[in-house]
Regions:
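Central I-helix of cytochrome P450 enzymes
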Residues: 213, 217, 221-222, 259-264, ...
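Conserved cytochrome P450 K-helix/beta-meander segment immediately N-terminal to the heme-binding cysteine loop
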Residues: 411-441, 524
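Conserved cytochrome P450 catalytic core segment spanning the I/J/K helices
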Residues: 170-171, 252-329, 362-363, 367, ...
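Conserved cytochrome P450 K-helix E-x-x-R motif and the immediately C-terminal K′/meander segment
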Residues: 80-101, 258-261, 265, 357-399, ...
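Cytochrome P450
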Residues: 2-12, 51, 107-114, 171-184, ...
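Cytochrome P450 heme-binding "Cys pocket" and the immediately downstream C-terminal segment
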Residues: 340-342, 409, 464-500, 504, ...
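N-terminal membrane-proximal hinge/A-helix region immediately C-terminal to the signal-anchor transmembrane segment
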Residues: 2-15, 19-148, 154-156, 160, ...
């Protein structure tokens, strides 16, 4: 449940009135068993000077001609601009990393960014949040939606709201949500997919995963069923619209208004129930049996907080939780479909561990290979692919790079995760790179080489929620179906709050016989 800055928001900040056409891009990954990798489409040259962005960078840098920062300036060509301002922003950032190294300066419209692709520098910036660095541009761009929600709040407000929200995500809550929400919603998805599996119709799995994660986050946050897998509504349309057009604030105003009204109504109804029942938290890992939602926990805590602040906090989790996990599921399914041996290995593990049962919280720790597949997917397709911070004071970064107060820093998670200086076989899908008997990889045990949930004080508060949701959802899906990519698709990439496909992820599904304890035992005895 990562708090994601919309990369396409950058185009709104830097390029309000210019629209550059979005072109299709093929993924640059070299996936095992894949022969589908094609270079990005070459765009025609233009009459515009190809070095205009570099000139703009030099004119905007605060260091002037006597630049003592030691940071090289990227020479941006026009061919890269449509990706920067309307497409897959992280791809030109990766190209420039290979040309200029792990840190360089870049102008995007009127803004000057220092782009970081080095784990040590990323660690320094992320760990020094609050003393040397702040969210900066993230808060400015997202305020129209999240208001003062803890995902973008700064200073003492962020500290107070984070302390209020984090206790709601305790182990007992997660254990109950796995059974009541994750499993049930995944089963509903399977039922929805069965007709397509039987008749061989192509299914846009990106769309289905988005619907699944919206239903999950609605129930987990508010005990509210969006039921987006089977129905549609103006609220669902508004949430989906926000995830696609967050930077286009005029178009998003109606969506924001409707979503805020819906959340406010849910808060009022839940508050009435809590007041009527005289409910109060009486234990550390408190869960209301009838309504285990985060909203119920926060209201039962009896903390003095305005309805507007509570609304903003919940909206932060709604949009981030829905968007992030949907993308994780999409790209993990894509990678597994490109690597049949890993898909079979994941299915065999699911069959062996679960023996036809629905997964429990305790089962998840035994789904080691599936977990590594998901982590490797988040390495190759991180959500979000960049993190933004702003220097509050003058600072010297590791490597003796100097930044001034007010400098915007763009940490390219995508670059760090794809760097050949950081990872062996960096562009390949290799789940086994993460030892199945070792700890689940995170920013700490990889020394910030792997930062899918950010790091430091502003690390995603919902990382365990999101990972559990992805593991359980895929485990249930793999129990019931196998999937193959529809041939001749152009699975390009574009960026919203996370990495999306350009045209969907179409798959053909094949129904599997669900393994029970008896069928699994019989299969083992005959082998």
């Amino acid at each position: 449940m990562s708090s994601s800055f919309s990369l396409s928001s950058l185009s709104s900040v830097t390029h309000h009135h210019h629209h550059l056409r979005r072109h299709r891009l093929s993924p640059s990954l070299s996936i095992k068993n894949s022969s589908n990798n094609k270079p990005p489409t070459t765009k025609p040259t233009s009459w515009v000077s190809p070095d205009w962005l570099t000139s703009l960078t030099k004119s905007l840098t605060t260091f002037g001609p006597k630049d003592e920062s030691n940071i090289p300036i990227a020479s941006a060509k026009l061919d890269d601009v449509s990706d920067l301002l309307g497409g897959a922003l992280f791809l030109p950032l990766f190209k420039w990393m290979n040309e200029y190294g792990p840190i360089y300066r870049l102008a995007a419209g009127p803004r000057d960014f220092v782009v970081v692709s080095d784990p040590a520098i990323a660690k320094h910036v992320l760990r020094n949040y609050g003393t040397k660095y702040a969210k900066g541009l993230v808060a400015e761009v997202s305020e129209f939606l999240f208001g003062s929600g803890f995902a973008i709040a700064e200073g003492s407000l962020w500290t107070v709201r984070r302390r209020a929200v984090v206790p709601s995500l305790h182990k007992k809550y997660l254990s109950i949500i796995v059974e009541r929400v994750f499993c049930r919603c995944a089963e509903q998805l399977v039922e929805k997919l069965k007709p397509d599996a039987l008749n061989g119709s192509p299914v846009n799995m990106e769309e289905k995963f988005s619907q699944l994660t919206l239903d999950v986050i609605g129930l987990a946050l508010f005990n509210y069923n969006f039921d987006s897998l089977t129905t549609n509504s103006p609220v669902i349309d508004s949430i989906n619209a926000l995830c696609k057009v967050i930077p286009r604030q005029i178009k998003a105003e109606k969506a924001v208004t409707l979503i805020r009204q819906t959340v406010e109504e849910l808060i009022v109804k839940c508050k009435e129930i809590v007041e009527n029942e005289g409910e109060r938290i009486n234990e550390e890992e408190y869960v209301n049996d009838a309504d285990p939602s985060i909203l119920r926990f926060l209201l039962a805590s009896r903390e003095e907080v305005s309805s507007a602040q509570l609304r903003d906090d919940l909206l932060s989790m709604l949009v981030a939780g829905h968007e992030t996990t949907g993308s994780v599921l999409t790209w993990t399914a894509y990678l597994l479909s490109k690597d049949p041996s890993s898909l079979r290995k994941a299915q065999e593990e699911v069959d062996r561990v679960l023996e036809g049962r629905l997964p429990t919280y305790e089962d998840v720790k035994n789904l080691k290979f599936l977990t590594r597949c998901i982590m490797e997917s988040m390495r190759l397709y991180p959500h979000p692919p960049v993190l933004l911070r702003r220097a509050q004071v003058e600072d010297v970064l590791p490597g003796n790079y100097k930044v001034n107060a007010g400098q915007d820093i763009m940490i390219s998670v995508y670059n760090i995760h794809h760097s050949a200086q950081v990872w062996e076989r960096a562009d390949e899908f290799v789940p086994e790179r993460f030892d199945s008997e070792g700890a689940v990889p995170n920013e700490t045990n990889t020394d910030f080489r792997f930062i899918p949930f950010s790091g430091g004080p502003r690390k995603c508060v919902g990382d365990q929620f999101a990972l559990l949701e992805a593991i359980v959802s895929l485990a249930v899906l793999l129990q019931h179906v196998s999937f193959d990519l529809v041939p001749d698709q152009n699975i390009g990439m574009t960026t919203g709050a996370t990495i999306h496909t350009t045209n969907g992820l179409y798959m053909k599904l094949t129904q599997r016989q669900r393994q029970t304890a008896s069928t699994f035992a019989a299969a083992n005895s005959s082998s």
